[in-house]
Amino acid sequence: PTLFRSVFTDEVQMLTSVEVGQGGVWLMCPPKLLFIPDRNGDLVPDGEPEVMLDGFDVARGNYHNFANGLRWGPDGWLYGRCGHSCPGRIGVPGTPDELRYPIDGGIWRYHPKRKVVEVLAHGTVNPWGHDWDEHGELFFINTVIGHMWHLIPGAHYRESGSGASQNPLIYERMSQHADHFHFDTNLAWHK
């Protein structure tokens, strides 16, 4: 059998995630979320990459907590994740710093038609993997400390650090939703 291979683009750097939809290809390339139009779906770009969001930090000493995990939600928003060691202040290009959304480990989403971004939850260390159940509820994993979480918009989850929440009105940070840990809780998490 003949194998078909096509290179859509090789003009991006730091690619951590790819998602197709809404007339093109979406690329998470920290510090930016890029969109390359492909309106007819022929796997040939219809234009240059467009920066849709920016402000995702790139930690120099920790290459596993980058913004990642693009996935279309059942609500038509594009969802993504960002690790704790790569905090940022995200927004559409040109957004002044005081109007940007801080993210320090958490889940965010972007609406492609309205061109708005929301940070839904903070406090996770290294979120990798998320999906929706049959009721449209979002669940995600965290590869350090607690590992199964139910996304509740506005939540600040308990993570390994004791840093303050981005939201000054948070009463208490939420624990994981799994019924067990993936380390011996009688010891420190890294032993």
What are the roles of these predicted feature ranges?
Residues 1-191:
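Beta-propeller domains with acidic blade repeats across secreted/periplasmic ectodomains
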